[in-house]
UniProtKB/Swiss-Prot annotation:
This is Small ribosomal subunit protein uS11. The keyword rRNA-binding applies. PROSITE patterns: RIBOSOMAL_S11. The keyword Cell division does not apply. One of its GO terms (cellular component) is ribosome. Gene3D superfamilies: Ribosomal protein S11 (3.30.420.80). It comes from Helicobacter pylori (strain Shi470). The gene is rpsK. Keywords: Ribonucleoprotein, Ribosomal protein, RNA-binding, rRNA-binding. The lineage of its organism: Bacteria, Pseudomonadati, Campylobacterota, Epsilonproteobacteria, Campylobacterales. It comes from the Bacteria. Located on the platform of the 30S subunit, it bridges several disparate RNA helices of the 16S rRNA. Forms part of the Shine-Dalgarno cleft in the 70S ribosome.
Length: 131
């Protein structure tokens, strides 16, 4: 029998960051939450699909709320107390995600910014669905 090489898991280094930026990307299929420091270095992230929501349940407001709570609990371990919010996309979890960041204890919201890209009549949109 060949021996298995067992590699040790990297230990997560706790950073002491007071301010962060919460990026909420709400698509029609999923909601991604990424928390960075002010320079843009990623501290932690969470997605609705990564929390066990599958299929159409990933795009629900409840799944977005759970993703925000998961990401903020990880960020609090790194000392994040004040955040700005950048929201992108037209998804259904967008408003709920913003509200749940604001209602989380120990985290103060400094500003909210919408960074959804809007075309100046660029690419042709996909054809209308016929169901």
């Amino acid at each position: 029998m060949a021996k298995r090489n067992v590699t040790a898991k990297k230990k997560v280094v706790k950073k002491n960051i007071a301010r962060g930026v919460v990026y909420i990307s709400a698509t029609f299929n999923n909601t991604n939450i990424t928390i960075t420091d002010e320079m843009g270095n990623v501290i932690c992230w969470s997605t609705a699909g990564g929390l066990g929501f599958k299929g159409s349940k990933k795009s629900t407001p409840y799944a977005a709320q759970q993703a925000v709570e998961s990401a903020l609990s990880k960020a609090k371990e790194h000392g994040v107390k004040e955040v700005g919010i950048k929201v992108q996309g037209p998804g259904s979890g967008r408003e709920t995600a913003i509200k749940s960041v604001g209602t989380t204890e120990g985290v103060k919201v400094l500003w909210i910014k919408d960074i959804t890209p809007l075309p100046h009549n660029g690419c042709r949109p996909p054809k209308r669905r016929r169901v």
